[in-house]
UniProtKB/Swiss-Prot annotation:
Residues reported to bind substrate: T28, G29, S30, T31, D83, G84, A85, D86, K96, G97, G98, G99, K123
Stated family: Belongs to the ribose 5-phosphate isomerase family.
Source species: Rhizobium johnstonii (strain DSM 114642 / LMG 32736 / 3841)
Name of the gene encoding the protein in the UniProt record: rpiA
This protein's name: Ribose-5-phosphate isomerase A
Family matches, as InterPro entries: NagB/RpiA_transferase-like, Ribose-5P_isomerase, Ribose5P_isomerase_typA_subgr, Ribose5P_isomerase_type_A
Record lineage: Bacteria, Pseudomonadati, Pseudomonadota, Alphaproteobacteria, Hyphomicrobiales
Keywords attached to this entry: Isomerase
Annotated EC: 5.3.1.6
EC category: isomerase
Chain's role: Catalyzes the reversible conversion of ribose-5-phosphate to ribulose 5-phosphate.
Catalysed reactions, semicolon-separated: aldehydo-D-ribose 5-phosphate = D-ribulose 5-phosphate
Amino acid sequence: MDAREMKIKAAEAALAHVESGMRLGIGTGSTAEEFVRLLAEKVAGGFRVEGVPTSERTARLCVELGVPLKSLDELPALDLTIDGADEVDQALRLIKGGGGALLREKIVAAASERMIVIADESKLVETLGAFALPIEVNPFGLVSTRIAIEKVAARLGLSGELDLRQSGDGEFTTDGGHHIIDASFGRIPDAEALSSELNSIPGVVEHGLFINMAALAIIAGPAGARTLQANR
């Protein structure tokens, strides 16, 4: 079973948690896109949902496949969000934002009764941090914000490259008009402390640590999909 087949298995298992009539947050990324394709097949057969996308990319795919969409202002309280992750640990702490949509992903997840994470088994880790942590920053005062991030990291015993994410024509810009610094710390032993410290930096708009947000993780491997439950 290749990586895409595992993503499809995870998406299929997540779809079983979606009930007709739900207000649904729809994530961003390759695994979330497999979920959208499966959801669209059910919608074509008469299944009713109203989706709130977490990125313009997801919105375009939903429109293309016929999944009905609303804005979060139109549906400010959601039943469920299904989204992928770049890393997930056994406590269901996540690193997200590889696709650049972390701010909207976090806003939508926070507006949901439940969040289910779907991933292939390569994303399940013992300790977060091998995947570079995306930190969404305001373009104004970027150098000062970068220095503040370096100081926070040093206080917590973390070090590594802080790379301003690039796209084909310069700095990557999020749907909200911000930039992303990818912090390669290698290992984050205290994700809660780092989250709190990053939140205290004025130039940091949001970061990719999702803590106490996911209720369930569906992890797919060659033997099929298994479920991890949040212990809180």
